[in-house]
């Protein structure tokens, strides 16, 4: 049973992620969604006593458990009202968010995708999940879909794939996910951002890349674009804003534009991105 995992908290950010996950499940034939809630220390009230010890207020625990159960019910209803054929399960963990996710992925081998809600510059809800996006995406053994709070789901037809010109012939991971890109009317846009203004790309290299992509993706329309921007993330988002883009796919490892960026710049890029979900392959 193909499964999507959605970490949740008490914010509109993860609620939107749940809505998108259900739509994604419908478009790509997933059958099961697991909602994961972890305990966050900031959610508890503490009774402080002498000698450095502290105890959690029992009333706070009961209140949190009740709130959590209501949250599960609310989010499950959001999914099932629109897609009653989907199976919805809940999971609760007392470990950190990243560890909880990795543990449940190991326990549930049917999980193929993690959907993460992300605060953005248009809407910020102080989501716990959003604060941990980078660590989750980097340590997750399965692909992750980052969903901006402001994003409203639309059918995926125009897919942008930023890539390194020197690693573009290593796109095997993308070819392993053809179920995403083989849909009817899908168009692929490969984008190389160079950060040096005087950098030129040899014509033979362009031809080689073109032939390689067409060899492996003969049935899928695709175009390769070359652009200059000192800031890679800015270059990608600028391109996406001026060219109809429904999804950005980040390639794994050193062939990904993420590989060259610090955590801060990735976080800033995700924060600036309010229009497109980002799928990070593994």
Give residue spans per PLM region.
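Intrinsically disordered or low-complexity boundary/linker segments at protein termini
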Residues: 1-16, 107, 112-173, 272-282
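Small/aliphatic-rich secondary-structure junction motif
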Residues: 1-56, 158-225, 245, 273
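Structural beta-alpha unit
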Residues: 23, 40, 77-114, 217-248, ...
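Residue-level recognition of beta-strand->loop/alpha-helix junctions
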Residues: 37, 92, 148, 192, ...
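A short acidic, glycine-rich active-site loop
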Residues: 55-70
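Short secondary-structure boundary segments
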Residues: 118, 192, 251-253, 282
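Charged helix-capping and loop-helix junction motifs
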Residues: 128-132, 204-209, 262-267
């Amino acid at each position: 049973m193909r499964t999507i995992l959605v970490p949740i908290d008490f914010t509109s950010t993860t609620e939107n992620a749940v809505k998108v996950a259900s739509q994604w499940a419908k478009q790509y034939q997933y059958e099961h969604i697991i909602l994961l809630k972890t305990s966050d220390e900031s959610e508890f009230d503490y009774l402080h006593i002498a000698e450095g010890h502290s105890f959690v207020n029992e009333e706070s625990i009961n209140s949190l458990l009740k709130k959590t159960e209501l949250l599960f019910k609310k989010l499950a209803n959001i999914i099932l009202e629109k897609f009653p054929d989907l199976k919805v399960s809940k999971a609760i963990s007392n470990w950190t968010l990243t560890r909880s996710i990795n543990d449940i992925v190991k326990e549930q081998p049917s999980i193929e995708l993690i959907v993460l809600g992300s605060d953005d510059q248009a809407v910020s809800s102080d989501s716990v999940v959003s604060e941990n996006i980078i660590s989750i995406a980097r340590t997750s053994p399965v692909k992750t879909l980052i969903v901006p709070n402001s994003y409203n789901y639309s059918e995926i037809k125009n897919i942008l794939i930023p890539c390194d010109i020197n690693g573009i012939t290593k796109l095997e991971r993308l070819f392993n996910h053809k179920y995403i890109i083989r849909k009817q009317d899908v168009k692929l846009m490969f984008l190389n951002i160079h950060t040096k203004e005087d950098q030129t790309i040899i014509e033979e290299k362009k031809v080689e890349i073109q032939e390689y992509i067409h060899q492996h993706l003969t049935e899928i329309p695709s175009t390769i674009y070359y652009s200059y921007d000192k800031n890679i993330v800015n270059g990608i988002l600028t391109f996406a804003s001026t060219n109809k883009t429904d999804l950005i796919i980040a390639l794994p490892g050193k062939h990904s534009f993420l590989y060259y960026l610090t955590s801060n710049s990735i976080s800033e890029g995700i924060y600036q991105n309010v229009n497109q979900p980002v799928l990070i392959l593994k």
